[in-house]
Amino acid sequence: MSVDADKQKKYRQIMERVVIPESVRRANSPEEIERRLRKPLAPGQVWTVVDDDEFCHVVIQSVHEDPRIVTVVPMSLDLESETPDSLVLMTGGIEGLPSIAWPDLAKDIPTRVLCKPLGMIDKQRFALIANNMPGENFSVYRGRELDEFGFLPEMKRERIDDFLYDCSMQCNLLTTLPSISDRRDGQKIQVRICRFLMEQCGMSRSDAEAASERPTQLNKETLEKLLTSGFEVDDLKKAELLPESLLCEIELPIVKETVEAYAQENPQNADPYVSLAQEAYGLAARHAKSHFGDWAAEIRKVRIQHHT
């Protein structure tokens, strides 16, 4: 048996004897996770970052003005992975458990790779992590320099650093976020388009409101009427910008799969709610005031349509 296989076997044997505290069970309940997801991002929150088949734990160091990006500090529950540049939290770490943090490895990553919220680190310990300082009063210590065999256990550290580096490179692929003024202008243009479609094209209010959210998807004849009546192409594009209240909270995988499945099954369907949901996922942004309800309501419409 290889060394790694032997370690895994011992780990499984240990975990089989571990009794998970009731507080941890409650913290991982679907209801508690949903409650956390409804909160806006904030420094001190602990999350699981997932991208492709890899994952790691992080604590949010700061939230950017562009809500699609956050700065995070990597963490680990593996106490054997401590290094000289790490901090060891003997209490109050990930879900209150002993944990390692690497403040020097802080990176900007896309909000969308934050997958599962794991609660908060208290203010005192978070301040120590943010300032990369040990604090014996809070059981936060500097990582040891050598392991029992005289080697630096850096493999885990390097693996996490490489993973977060790959995540951080995705920030360069984000498109420029529409300004608040442009989004507000877009909402005003939507109202004008809606009024035009009702008065000049005989649409019902509900149809006109839906069409005004995606005017470029109107049929050729109606589109020409819009353009000849004084609307510019740029106006139509502005009308399709998401309003502030619909910047999405987070990419919920199960909902994303539903939307993608609906789009694949209905490739010719220009349903504005499908487009809206897809654009929301593309932005993967959290608004500071957390309009989760508005966004979730639009997604629910897509799900209802998909299942009926």
What are these regions (language model features)?
Residues M1-M15, E31, G92-F196, G202, ...:
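C-terminal terminal-subdomain/extension
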Residues M1-R35, P40, K238-E240:
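Compositionally biased, charged N-terminal/linker segments
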Residues P43-G44, P103:
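Loop/turn positions that initiate beta-strands
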Residues T48-G92:
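Compact nucleic-acid interaction/catalytic patches
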Residues H57-V59, A208, L236:
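Alpha-helix N-cap/helix-start motif at helix boundaries, enriched for small hydrophobics
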Residues M198-S229, A239-E244:
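Recognition helix of helix-turn-helix/homeodomain-like DNA-binding domains
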Residues S212, L227-R300:
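Short amphipathic recognition helices of helix-turn-helix/homeodomain-type DNA-binding modules
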Residues K301-H306:
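Mid-protein regulatory/catalytic core that forms ligand/cofactor-binding pockets
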